[in-house]
From Swiss-Prot:
Family per similarity comment: Belongs to the snaclec family.
Keywords: Disulfide bond, Glycoprotein, Hemostasis impairing toxin, Platelet aggregation activating toxin, Secreted, Signal, Toxin
Glycosylation sites: 116
Name recorded for this polypeptide: Snaclec agglucetin subunit alpha-1
GO cellular component: extracellular region
Amino acid sequence: MGRFIFVSFGLLVVFLSLSGTGADVDCLPGWSAYDQSCYRVFKLLKTWDDAEKFCTERPKGGHLVSIESAGERDFVAQLVSENKQTDNVWLGLKIQSKGQQCSTEWTDGSSVSYENFSEYQSKKCFVLEKNTGFRTWLNLNCGSEYAFVCKSPP
């Protein structure tokens, strides 16, 4: 009976330590897991369009990062900070002109359900703003060159 309790307790500890870490997601080497997706910071300086193209050409595909919750925002901010990024970082959000209407959507096609805009300017592409610890979004000129974060399926 004592052995059963000991083994059960050990399994419980392992389960609890792995839950919520993305441990069940199998990412390529150099990529980090969070909530069923893989993420990687690239320090290459690219325009927004070139960065998005680069992300889609990765072995498992993907897009510039979309951020759909405060938890994901914090994970990405930590990942960017750990990579000692010294400037703003592109994310996969762009203002799209459709006829006379504009819409904002993620490059992976998902709608914007979580927002964290720093301020709104008349530019079309968004970065994670360095001055806020990469936690808020600022729209800048799409032709500027910044590092970026790709998000891909596992």
